[in-house]
């Protein structure tokens, strides 16, 4: 298991990753490697045909001062593509009103392969094409992404 957290409030632009900048629980097996701020490499190094991981994302998010109050969302991305089932949406009633999101995805990596995993601010208004998404959100410090090998 490995866990990475943010140490300060972050302004994250639409379709960008959350910068996890501190290792809370290090991975001692070499299966999870941070390669960039907010991007993790997960390895499928195993004697089996695959390695399976549970990736959990949690944190508090809000529309920053000066932003438009719309639905905001975070999702888990694998190799840059957001997993639709992992998108967690929060609809604030006012600017700077924080809401907690928690989501997870199960990711299967074939033996000998790797995948990049990240948490991304995505459009929470895509069900309403007439609404323009907020260009950026605030992600409160102590947001975390946890990677746990389950098979």
Q: Can you describe what each PLM-predicted range is?
A:
Residues 1-151:
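Extracellular jelly-roll beta-sandwich "head" domains, especially the C-terminal globular C1q domain
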């Amino acid at each position: 298991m490995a866990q990475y957290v943010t140490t300060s409030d972050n302004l994250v632009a639409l379709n960008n990753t959350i910068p996890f900048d501190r290792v809370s629980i290090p991975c001692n097996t070499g299966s999870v490697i941070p390669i960039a701020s907010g991007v993790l490499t997960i390895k499928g190094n195993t004697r089996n045909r695959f390695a399976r991981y549970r990736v959990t994302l949690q944190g508090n998010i809000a529309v920053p001062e000066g932003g438009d109050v719309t639905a905001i969302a975070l999702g888990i991305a694998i190799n840059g593509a957001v997993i639709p089932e992992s998108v967690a949406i929060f609809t604030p009633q006012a600017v700077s009103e924080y809401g907690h999101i928690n989501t997870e995805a199960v990711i299967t990596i074939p033996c000998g392969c790797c995948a990049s995993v990240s948490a991304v601010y995505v459009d929470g208004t895509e069900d309403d094409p007439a609404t323009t998404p907020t260009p950026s959100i605030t992600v409160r410090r102590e947001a975390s992404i946890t990677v746990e090998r389950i098979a």
